[in-house]
Amino acid sequence: MHILDTVDAASLRTDVPQFRAGDTLKVHVNIIEGKNSRVQVFQGFVLGRQGDGIRETFTVRKVSFGVGVERTFPVHSPIIDKIEVVTKGDVRRAKLYYMRALRGKAAKIKEKRDFSTAK
C-alpha cells in the first residue's frame, strides 16, 4: 500500500481552501466543448464532504430558476480551476441532506460570525 500512497500524494492539490458543510462556494470548472475550453462558475452551498485523500469529494447545491441543482466534485480533480469560499455557514451537521426538502426562508443558512477580530 505504500506505493499507492506515494502515487496518490503526487496527484493531491495544494491550493484547496478550508471549507465545510454549510459554506457557500464558487467552483470554477473547466468545460471542454470540442476544441474550445471555457471556465464555468458553479456557486452554491456545500451539502457535505465524503471520502479521504485522492478519493475525497464534495457536493454543492444551488437553486437555479426554482429547480434545485446538485453537483458532486472530486476535491483533487484537474477540471477544477479554483475553489473560492464566499461565506462561512453556521450549521450543526456534517451532511445537510435535510436542506433538499426546505423552501424559501427555511432554506437559508445562517452566516458564521467571526468574533476574533472584534475587541
UniProtKB/Swiss-Prot annotation:
Gene3D superfamilies: 2.30.30.790. The gene is rplS. Keywords: Ribonucleoprotein, Ribosomal protein. InterPro entries: Ribosomal_bL19 (IPR001857), Ribosomal_bL19_CS (IPR018257), Ribosomal_bL19_sf (IPR038657), Translation_prot_SH3-like_sf (IPR008991). GO terms for molecular function: structural constituent of ribosome. Signal peptide: none annotated. This is Large ribosomal subunit protein bL19. It comes from Arthrobacter sp. (strain FB24). Pfam families: Ribosomal_L19. One of its GO terms (biological process) is translation. Belongs to the bacterial ribosomal protein bL19 family. The keyword Cell cycle does not apply. One of its GO terms (cellular component) is cytosolic large ribosomal subunit. This protein is located at the 30S-50S ribosomal subunit interface and may play a role in the structure and function of the aminoacyl-tRNA binding site.
